[in-house]
Amino acid sequence: MGSEMCIRDSFYSYNLFMHVPDGFMNVTMSAATGVISFGTLWAYIRSAKDLIADKFIALTGMMSALIFVLQMINFPIAAGTSGHLLGGALAVIVLGPRLGLICLSVVVIIQSLLFADGGLSALGVNVLNMAIVTSATSWFIVKYWIKFIGKNKTSIVSVSVLAGILSVVFSSIAFTIQYAIGGT
């Protein structure tokens, strides 16, 4: 689930913003996370050249479309907020860490540009939190925990669920640290 941020407007109603909106982080934090996010994305794109084949391109495109649609479905959490699935664990488990990160980054960038989910100045923050942190967390959990509990259907499902849950937790922690350092 991606967390929603509530900001009260002058009529005391709640406006919900998915992702981190423009102006929520200072310029330094926005620039730093932009460099980190797009530097990482560029490195992953260059390293994924060996994976680019017809079947991987189609699968990556379908996974991006699926995650895009799943992120459009919001459900209430509490106190005027709602959440949606992030899809990081799903993308990484199906596509691997490199294509999974690229897939999630494409989804976040399209949402920012076409639907104003977040904004251009906050794009680095959103890519870092929703693509890089969720991908890294999911891949680490799946790769290393499966060694301890074995590879069968039950263990793969349980590790996948754990990866999905913990990727959201670590993404939230990353946002909290970023906001503590560079929030406005």
Located regions from the model:
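Lipid-exposed faces of alpha-helical membrane segments in multi-pass integral membrane proteins
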Residues: 32-39, 62, 66-69, 106, ...
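Alpha-helical membrane segments and adjacent membrane-interface helices in multi-pass membrane proteins
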Residues: 71-134
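Membrane-helix interface motif
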Residues: 173-184
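Hydrophobic alpha-helical transmembrane segments
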Residues: 31-32, 57-62, 86, 101-105, ...
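Short, small-residue-biased leader/transition segments that mark boundaries at the very start
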Residues: 1-7
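Hydrophobic, aromatic-rich alpha-helical transmembrane segments
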Residues: 23, 27, 48-57, 97, ...
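Hydrophobic transmembrane alpha-helices
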Residues: 11-90
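Short helix-perturbing small/polar motifs within transmembrane alpha-helices
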Residues: 130-175
